Amino acid sequence: MTMKVKLLTTSVALALSMTAFSSNAVDFSGYFRSGVGVSQDGDMQTGNQSLVGRLGNESDTYTEIGIGQEVYNKDGKVFYVDSMFSMQSNGSNDYESTATVCDFDKKQCSEDATFALRQFNVKAKGLISAAPDAVVWAGKRFYQRHDLHIIDTKYWNISGAGAGIENLKAGPGAFSLAWIRSDGNDIDNSIVDNDLNVNFLDLRYAGWAPWEGAWTEAGVSYAMPNPTDEQKATGGKYDPENGVMLTAEMSQYFAGSGINEKLVLQYANKGLAQNMISQGGGWYDVWQLTDDAKGYRVILTGDIPLGDKFSVNHVFTYGKGEKLQEWHDNTELFSAVARGGYAWTDIMKTLVEAGTYESTKTWTSGAEDKSSGQKYTLAQAWSAGPSMFARPEIRVFASYLKDGEGESFNGGEDDSTWNFGVQAEAWW
């Protein structure tokens, strides 16, 4: 009888708590893209989105679904629970699940779709009386990611499970401090424990405006590999040195013209150096020997309106990395992507995107590996508004892709190909 009473009490308490939580609206957010397309040789042939642009250069189905709710708000104390799941597939058929399909004769397995837990965290505001606007958080989250949408990459992205404090006001801006875990997995097969624990300390200051229309942010992302005793004894890639990535950026809005430009300067060393030439945002390279590695990157991105109906978004990147692996001398990367849009009506527009890149990898022997390519896309789009980034959007596109150094298309027979398709994209 006592057990029944306890169970009943617990059930009532849970029901009451759920009723209390449901009095606050649930925040539903997300992103998705999906579509269909063909090329001159089978289905769509895509690649190098972060170098030549993503418009007309994506063939997958991808979605992120976020659900969050404020669960407590009293006397200036606020608690918020946030979550997000993602799914990705190649969009090849109707039923795409996580079921694994295996060909045991070939000892190969594949999955239709992959699902992932991307965010699950608690944010609390008002816990620090001296800093009532500061937010204390813990859990798994996207941490203040800095995005370049038209090339689908984040140049500053220290995300994962962790904890931190955001928006600590100081002077004209605010500090944010976080401890985030981002391990390197499956380094090699030399030992059983081949996953290396890596922790980041991330410190940022944002909000200083040196003059009208300007806005700045700067930060230090410090990576600390944390090997086990077995990994230390193994040495090499299992016992790398701490690395740092420094980021400084300035945004400028030019009143009257509507132009927005952002300049980003970055420096990184050790396992973080490869981000400077891979369009990465902060992952630590545990698969190469990087104790002598260093690199830097310059990014210029922005929006340029040309009249009431036409605008251009652009991303220019130059990066250089040295000693990124054994026998490596240096790698240089240049990438330029621009997307223009002309709004015919409030819901219809024409889009043009052009992108080019060139990468040169030099070895200590003097040998060079080069890669380069271009992409050109024309699209007709219908969206919920005239701006270039109004969403949802449905677009019909045609793309031409060119390999500047080899024959990577149409089964390795051609240095170019074309794609034609229809895609939808939305965020909310």
Swiss-Prot record:
* N-terminal signal peptide: 1-25
Q: Which InterPro entries match?
A: G_neg_Bact_CarbUptk_Porin, Maltoporin, Porin_LamB, Porin_LamB_sf
Q: How does this chain sit within the bilayer?
A: Multi-pass membrane protein
What does induction of this protein depend on?
A: By maltose.
Q: Does the keyword Signal apply?
A: yes
* Function summary: Involved in the transport of maltose and maltodextrins.
What is this protein's name? Maltoporin 1
The organism is: Aeromonas salmonicida (strain A449)
